[in-house]
């Protein structure tokens, strides 16, 4: 049961403003891995057709990629992780909720949403001294290690729309576990 009722009008905008409350903070949002934009959250007019977000504030509008090209989405312009996101492709999807609840026993679970496919994305508020322990546990349970290696990785946008047309539904949201 989600601490905040999803069916009582919780919207994408409300969730994003709680996840990223700094009005001057830059966020990177994408319609695809190749079509994205970095701006202040309030500058985005309609994110309903987007499917991705970086779970960290961006430090500047553009950075330099490892290939030496300018980009709005790269490690050079990505700040520290704000949230740690697990994507479970394995084991089977029926086991994902139990795995997430097991991690929730130790780490602060903020949000769970559908990938719009077969997996769930679980957003955690992890303290700096817990980072290594968190990833060790998450990967042991089947989380994709790619999200651990790259803090600028795209994750699924709450209530976004995947390229297959499915909404990335939020199932759980606990505003008491948000970052300050």
Outline where the language-model segments fall:
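DNA replication initiation on ssDNA origins
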Residues: 1-83, 155, 159-161, 178
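Long, low-complexity interaction regions most often at the N-terminus
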Residues: 3, 107, 132-136
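Short, glycine- and small/hydrophobic-rich beta-strand elements in well-ordered beta-sheets
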Residues: 4, 105-114
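DNA replication initiation modules
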Residues: 8, 60, 65-100, 126-180
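Short aromatic/hydrophobic-glycine micro-motifs
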Residues: 25, 108-109, 143
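Short glycine-enriched loop/turn motifs at secondary-structure junctions
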Residues: 79-80, 116-118
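A generic structural motif
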Residues: 118-124
